[in-house]
């Protein structure tokens, strides 16, 4: 019997798209012959994480499948591999990921990623949407870099960038728990790494979304500079703090200027409106921000128990503002497009269920290497959805995907000089599992 036989499809996918080979080439060291190919080891770790592994010792779940997969590295070898991932090797690893991603996207229809949507409406087919956000990861023991956090917990505060079109986790940076939510250099560094992951042909038309933590002069100036480059269109949609000048501008909005807001599906949202404040703000306030920045505010009747400021208590509305450099479009649509950034919370939750939620080592460098494997696992999951999963499995949460596909058992048989994996006929998703394997094997091997 082979447990978790469905996870073999993830490993096969890594081989078919060329990830294993690219990582092997990137991590080869002259004059050093490793007992286990380092690219294969990292793919096995990513496969283990995708299948639900939380600790390096969980690599034994793949070693159990040696009759199908061949030799699999032991836990000590995995530890050594992660220890060997110096910053220089991590950079080579990221370049390998980018080359593979270019090939994976090239295999999609028309050679482009799925079109992002907002308010139930497709955005520009050429637009790539990047969502940047940070999250807290708790540490339950002393670890290097683990500190007290802003929420009075103990752990780390990594920051990542997700591609909304494909759900890929493009970049992930480990930070101490006391790292700021609005640290400009961290935002710029992780966005630079994320953009470098995109195929060159898809870097020229971007939309960067962030919550209020990204509303810093440095980040918006940097994005404006990218937008000013010839041939580039870089938009942003970033949360904005409700300060006293913003409150004064809200008081100046005529009643007729408020427009109805939209739900995520594009329907009218009751008791919610949007308005633009750009022309109502004190010019001295806007002078310090990049030219072309628009300030848009949304108001909504507060939900029971919602925390309100004194201004909101008095006014009877709850306000949220954001800024964008998009020149055209209805205010309601721009606001709905910004609120679609909330999808990143699902991406973070999935990442925490796929390796991010538990860091294995006391050493900071090894935990950063572990996060690099988490990005590999996220890539493989996203690519599995894009290229192999049938419709019945594409929207599954990680836990459901494991139960239905990755953890299905199979019986290994031999005949005609071939090995066969035989699935239980009673498995409700047996057809979907077979369909997934068939589609993975149909991916053309790298030239």
Positions of PLM-derived features:
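Dynamic "connector" segments at or just before major functional cores
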Residues: 1-155, 160-180, 185-201, 385, ...
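Short amphipathic alpha-helical "interface-anchor" segments enriched in bulky aromatics
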Residues: 13, 59, 331-382
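Short secondary-structure boundary/capping segments
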Residues: 85, 144-148, 222-227, 251-257
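Flexible loop/turn segments at secondary-structure boundaries
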Residues: 137-139, 168, 178-181, 214-218, ...
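Domain-level cores of phosphate- or acyl-group-handling catalytic modules
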Residues: 181, 185-245
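Basic, amphipathic alpha-helical segments enriched in Lys/Arg and hydrophobic/aromatic residues
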Residues: 357-430
């Amino acid at each position: 019997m082979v447990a978790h036989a469905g996870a073999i499809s993830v490993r096969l996918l890594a081989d078919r798209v060329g990830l294993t080979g690219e990582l092997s080439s990137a991590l080869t060291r002259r004059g050093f012959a490793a007992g286990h190919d380092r690219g294969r080891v990292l793919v096995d770790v990513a496969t283990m994480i995708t299948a639900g592994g939380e600790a390096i010792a969980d690599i034994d779940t793949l070693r159990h499948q040696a009759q199908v997969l061949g030799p699999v590295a032991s836990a000590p070898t995995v530890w050594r591999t992660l220890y060997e991932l110096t910053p220089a090797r991590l950079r080579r690893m990221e370049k390998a990921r980018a080359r593979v991603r270019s090939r994976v996207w090239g295999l999609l229809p028309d050679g482009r990623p799925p079109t992002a949507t907002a308010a139930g409406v497709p955005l520009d087919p050429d637009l790539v949407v990047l969502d940047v956000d940070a999250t807290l990861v708790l540490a339950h023991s002393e670890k290097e870099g683990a500190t007290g956090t802003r929420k009075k917990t103990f752990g780390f505060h990594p920051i990542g960038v997700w591609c909304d079109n494909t759900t890929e986790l493009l970049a992930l940076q480990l930070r101490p728990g006391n790292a700021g939510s609005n640290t400009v250099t961290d935002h710029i560094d992780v966005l630079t790494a994320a953009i470098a992951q995109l195929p060159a042909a898809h870097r020229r038309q971007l939309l960067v979304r962030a919550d209020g933590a990204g509303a810093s002069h440095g980040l918006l100036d940097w994005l404006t500079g990218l937008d000013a480059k010839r041939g580039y269109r870089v938009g942003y949609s970033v949360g904005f703090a409700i300060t006293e000048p913003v409150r004064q501008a809200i008081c100046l909005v005529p009643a007729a200027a408020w427009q109805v807001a939209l739900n995520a599906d594009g329907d009218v949202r009751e008791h919610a409106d949007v308005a633009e404040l750009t022309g109502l703000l004190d010019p001295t306030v806007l002078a310090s921000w990049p030219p072309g920045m628009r300030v848009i505010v949304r108001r909504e009747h507060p939900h029971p128990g919602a925390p309100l400021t004194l201004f909101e208590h008095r006014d009877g509305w709850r306000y949220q503002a954001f800024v964008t450099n998009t020149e055209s479009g209805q205010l309601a649509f721009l606001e709905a497009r910004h609120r679609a950034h909330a999808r990143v919370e699902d991406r973070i939750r999935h990442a925490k269920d796929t390796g991010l939620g538990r860091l294995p080592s006391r050493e900071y460098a090894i935990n950063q290497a572990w996060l690099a494997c988490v990005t590999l696992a996220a890539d493989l999951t996203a690519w599995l959805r894009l290229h192999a999963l049938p419709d019945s499995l594409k929207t599954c949460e990680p836990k459901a995907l494991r139960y239905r596909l990755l953890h299905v058992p199979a019986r290994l048989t031999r005949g005609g000089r071939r090995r066969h994996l035989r699935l239980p006929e009673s498995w409700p998703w047996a057809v979907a599992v077979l369909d997934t394997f068939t589609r993975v094997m149909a991916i053309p091997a790298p030239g």
